[in-house]
Structures are given as C-alpha cells and as structure tokens.
Amino acid sequence: MSVRVRIAPSPTGDPHVGTAYMALFNMIFARHYNGTFILRIEDTDRARSRPEYEENIYSALKWANIQWDEGPDIGGAYGPYRQSERFDIYKQYAEELLSKGKAYKCFCTAAELDEMRELSAKQGGRQGYDRRCRHLTPDEIIEREQAELSYVIRLKVPLNGECVYEDAIKKRMTFPWADIDDQVLLKSDGFPTYHLANVVDDYLMKISHVIRGDEWMSSTPKHILLYESFGWTPPTFLHMPLLLGKDGKKLSKRKNPTSIFFYRDSGYLSEAFINFLTLMGYSMTGDQEIYSLDDIIREFDYKRIGVSGAIFDVQKLDWVNQQYLIKNIPVEQLWDRIKEWSFNDEFMQRLMPLCHSRIKTFGDFMDLFNFLFINHLHYNDAIFVVKDLSKEQICYLIQSLIWRLDELENWNGTGVNQASREIAEIFGVNHKKIVMPILFASLMSKTQGPPLFDSVNLLGKDRTRARLLKAMEYLGGISNKKMASLKKAWQEKSGQPLMIKD
C-alpha cells in the first residue's frame, strides 16, 4: 500500500503554528516512507474563509520549508483540492447514506434545538440532540418535505455498544456510542460539515494514514462509523499531542503569539523553527537536539512520537535558533540572512518615506526606528504615565483594542486607527491624549515616535498584537473579576464606568 497523508487547514485567519506542526509531521512521514503529502483546503466556512488567507497558508508553510506534492496551487490526480469545489460530491454521498438507512433527515428548527439544550441542562441529562426526527415515519417525512420545511442530514449513531479502534500512537481507544451525538453531516444550505467532507475526501484521495492533533480523537468514532456505513476501510489514525502554552493549556493566541508569520517576522530561521517543532512532539535517538530535516526524515519512527502534550517554550526556540546561527550559518553568510529577514529592499523602501523628513543625520535612523528591528522592547513605568489612569485601566484599553483588532477583516494602518478611535469612544477617553500615548508606549517603548499608524503597517499584525500582550503583561494584567466586567462592557460597547476611579 502506498503511503498518502494530508493536512487540511481552513483559510479563516492567520496560519497557526499548529498547522505547521501537523504539516511538518505529515511531510516527514510521507518522505520517510516514500509516500505522498497532500495539502487540502477546508474552505466551507463561507463567513470566514478568504482567498488571501489561503495564500497566507501557502506562504507560511513554504517559509517553514514544508513542501506538498498535491494541492490546490499545484494540482494532482485527486482534485479538486478545495472543499468548496466538491459540494456535489458530498451531497451525493449524503444521499447514499440516506438510501442505506445510515442517516436521516432532521427537520428541527433552531428554536427547537435551543429548547432541547436548555431542557437537558436543567435536567442534567444527556447533552445533544434528542433524536426526535430519527423516529419519524415515512409519511411524516413526506408531509414535512411537501411543506418545504428545511432539514439537515444527521448520522444515525448506534444507541448502545462501543466504538473500539487502534490508534497508532494512543493504542486501543474505546468510546461508548451513548456518548456520541447524531452528528449533522449536511446542513440545510447544502454545505457539508467537517465530518462528512473529511471522510469522503480522505477516501476519494486514497489517504492511508490520518495524522492529526489529539483534539480530534473524540470525533474519530463518528469518522469510523462513516467509513463502515459506506463499506470502506478506515485509514490508520495517528493522533499527535497538542502544543501547549507554559500554563499547560492548549496554545492560544490570547496569551501567546501563535501565527507562523510572527516567528518569521521576528527573525527566526525557518530551519531552526521546524527543528524546534519536531522536538515538541518527537524524541530523536541520542541526546543531540540540533538536526537537519534530512536527518529527521531518515531516522523517523512514528513510535517515538510523544503521547502527552508538548510545551511550546519560546526560550527553547531561542536556544535552538542560536545553535543554528552558530553552527549552520557561516559568518560570511550572516549579513545576507539578516538582510533577507528585515533589511531587504522591499521593507526598506516602505520605511524610507517615514524616515526621509525625520532624521537630521544617518545616525538618527536607528534611534528613531529601532523598534522595528528588535523583538523584545524594554518597558518602564514612565512611558505608561497617561493622565490619571491606573495600570489596570490602561490594560482595559489595550485588551479591548486587541479584541477589536481581531475583528478587522483587512489589517492596515487606517483600520487600526479607526479601531483605536472606536475604543476611545467606548471608554469615553480622548484618542490623542490617552489611546495614542498608550500605543506609542506599547508598540515602540517611546512616548512619541514616527507616525503611529504607518509604523503599525510596518510592524504587521502579528508583532503588533504580540507587543500589546507584552505591554499588558508588564503592566500587571487584569484580575479575573475585572476581566469579567471588561467583557461585559465590551459586549455592551460601554466601558466608561471602568475608567472612573473607585
């Protein structure tokens, strides 16, 4: 059997380090076994999927030296490789499940589903759909169809017994069917859910091994049931440990920079980055920690993949990157790599208009723009003295701005400017005297500097967000009680009471 593996990211935001992590191990697995690595785009979320996000996935993975053999951008024998181009296929297979009696039409309205959830929560019973449409008679189904009621197609999950399967990493896994909901497979608008599209695509693309994060383990019984319902042989499942933050919880952008672009723009070597990611979920033989990708591929053994979550430790990444710089980048190549990182012509041409009328001598250049070329700003209390606001109140403004910036569809200086003005209005403070000084301090560690929102364009979304988080950390953050008040104020878009001294 030929080895075929895949990753299937969704183009709904910035490329996550978890995407690179899974892509890396899929690629290593394929290369070690002389197989094929496929990139598939799961773009069925119409509200959030965007072509530019898809392009970002390609750019981020290519920066990390992750290469695929089939995909939307390069084609292949099993395309199309975007789920949005395969809707007719999913509908066909959903209808097949209906005809086999393995699925059923559910006509319940959103209001009825909400009522079910509320009732089960009050009674402390089984959470999820109560399966009322599963027992409709043929005549009742025809009656609802003739009334042109909308419906979804649900998977008919066994009411008792267990799903037992062998995971290549986690070993034998057992899930009672009573704990598994009758999963929606096809929504009322004809769009498939992840579960149907995932299984159909993996089968048609002849995927032999599914290598993914262990957050998908609870969904695997549904996928195995789908394979059995179609009469197909399931692939081998390998569930990888998740990347965790220092707090031991799933890596989250609320506390850590999670975009691949953040690490690229911060000056990490792509070779060191993938070496570091490999160490997160895998142990090489011996005590060496610096390996080339070729070494990892040659010696790879999936049995050495860890079972428990791995801590994404940026200090360890710094160490790995430094070792790569010392051992793998000759002195005569160092300046070329630094220029490639941030002193490249494209970046400097964007910077020069800001610089041209603001320096008296060339010696002023780095003093004015040093914040663009360093990763770790050094804050002090003096730069955060803003009128009579407390440190916690400054954090309210910063956190709310982060939430607002996360909502921006297009990141640019104009959008950030407008977002910051909205925050000033919500909290009833002066934009120029309060919000802008906080941004200068957070993003540049200065009380003033070059044009703020032009500078934000140069910093980019990921580094801007990371610096706002770091500023909050320096200021002491927000207590849990106050965070609850802030969330309420944010939802109501009225933060003035939080800015009034007790």
UniProtKB/Swiss-Prot annotation:
The answer to whether keyword Lipid metabolism applies is no
Protein name according to UniProt: Glutamate--tRNA ligase
Q: How does it assemble?
A: Monomer.
* InterPro entries documented for this protein: aa-tRNA-synth_I_cd-bd, aa-tRNA-synth_I_codon-bd_sub2, aa-tRNA-synth_I_CS, aa_tRNA-synth_I_cd-bd_sf, Glu-tRNA-ligase_bac/mito, Glu/Gln-tRNA-synth, Glu/Gln-tRNA-synth_Ib_cat-dom, GluQ/Sye
| Localization per Swiss-Prot or TrEMBL | Cytoplasm
For this protein's source organism, the top of the classification is: Bacteria, Pseudomonadati, Chlamydiota, Chlamydiia, Parachlamydiales
Give the organism the record lists.
Protochlamydia amoebophila (strain UWE25)
Query: Main localisation, per the record?
Result: cytoplasm
Residues forming the motif 'KMSKS' region are: 250-254
